[in-house]
Amino acid sequence: MGDDRAVIKFSSEDCGICHKMSFYDQKVTEELGLRFIDVKMQDTATYRKYRQVLLTQYPDKSAMGWPTYLVCEAPEGEFQILGEVKGGHPKGEFRSRLQAILELATIEPSS
């Protein structure tokens, strides 16, 4: 598969749930064959690189969760958002939510 699919985690240094999720979010993401991109809002260079992806989903950032995981294709190029996982979840549920997004993306080619 030539797909460049990634999970972009938007989080904040002072977010306790974000920190807790970091014990397994990257591992689960990579086990599912996706790249993991960690974007902390305080890291302006990295945030600037992926800001457009976040603003496409949340134009004013008000409804985003902490953390917000956006599953997307070609995150550095003509990206397409496939789905999202918002907030903190136990490891098993986080995996299930990512798998559900991937299954939908495989079944329904987006228009």
Predicted segments, located by residue:
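Local sequence-structure signature of Cys/Sec-based thiol-disulfide redox active-site neighborhoods
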Residues: 1-35
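Chalcogenol-based redox active-site neighborhoods
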Residues: 16-26, 44-45, 49, 53-64
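Non-catalytic, surface beta->alpha helical segment in thiol-disulfide oxidoreductase systems
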Residues: 64-110
